Amino acid sequence: MSAAPLRFAHLSIAQYAICLKGIVWREGLRFLHQRERFVSALVRPLVWLFIFAAGFRQVLGISIIPPYETYILYEVYIAPGLLAMIQLFNGMQSSLSMVYDREMGNMRTLLVSPFPRWFLLSSKLIAGTLVSLLQVYVFLAIAWFWEIEPPPIGYIAVLPALILSGLMLGALGMLISSAVKQLENFAGVMNFVIFPMFFASSALYPLWRVQEASPALYYVCQLNPFTHAVELIRFALYGKLNVLSLAVVCGCMAVFMIGAILAYDPARGLPARRGRAAED
C-alpha cells in the first residue's frame, strides 16, 4: 500500500465534517471582520442597477426572449448578470485571500494536515461559495424594492444555480491563484480576467444584439463560461432550466477545480517572502 492511502485511511467521515465546518467557520469570521468587503460587494452591483440601468433603459429595450414571457425593463434583464457578478468578484476575492495565506505560510500549515489536498481546497471553495450566497440574497432583497420581482418560487429555484455558478467561478479564481507567484501581481491578473468575462457575456445585453453588431464577438460570448453562469441563474430565477448552460457550468467547474488541485503549490511565495525579510 502506498504512503498516501496510509495517511488518509484513519480519517472518519465525522473528522472530515469537523474539518469542513472549521474552514467554513474561519471564512465566515473573516468575512464578518471585513465589513468593507461586504459593503463593496453590494455597492458595485447596486451602482450598475440604479445608475447604469436608468441611463440605458430607453436605449437598450429588451424584446421577448426566454425565459421571459413578456417585455421586461432593462434592470430586470441585468439582475441575473449582477448576481453572477457578485459571485465572480467574491470568487476572486477569496482567491486573493488564498494568495495572502500562502505567502504568510498559513496555507502550507493547512495542507500538511492529515486531510487530502483536494478536500482542503474543496472546503475553501465551498466556504467562499456560501459567503457569495449571503451577498447574493441580500442584493436580491434590496433589488425587490426596485421592482425586480421574480416569481416567489424563483428565490428557491435559483439556489442550486447559484451554488454551481459560485463553485465554478470560485474554482476559476483558485486556478488563477495557483499560477500567481506574488500577492502584488494578483490584482492586475484579477482585473484582466474579471472585466473581459463580464463584458463579453450576456450579463448586460442579449446575445442576439451582440450577434447583430459583431458575429465574432457573439461566438466569444458563447464560449465564455460566465455567459452560461448568467443564463443558468436567469432561467432558474423563473423556474426554468437551461440544459446547455448547466452542462457548461458543471464541466468548467470540474476542469477548473482539477486544474487548481493539480497546480496548487502551498510553498509558492515563501522564497520571495524570505528574500524580502532577509533584505530588511
Language model: regions and residue ranges:
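Short, membrane-interfacial amphipathic segments enriched in basic
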Residues: 2-25, 169, 213-227
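Short helix-capping/hinge motifs at transmembrane helix termini and TM-loop junctions
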Residues: 52-61, 89, 143-151, 180-182, ...
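Membrane-interface helix starts
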Residues: 25-47, 241-247
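Hydrophobic alpha-helical transmembrane segments of multi-pass membrane transport proteins
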Residues: 47-52, 71-146, 192, 197-198
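Transmembrane helix segments
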Residues: 54, 58-60, 177-223, 227
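Alpha-helical transmembrane segments and their short interhelical loops
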Residues: 117-191, 240-263
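Membrane-interfacial helix-loop-helix junctions in multi-pass membrane proteins
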Residues: 30, 202-255
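Junction motif at the cytosolic side of a transmembrane helix
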Residues: 4, 237, 247-280
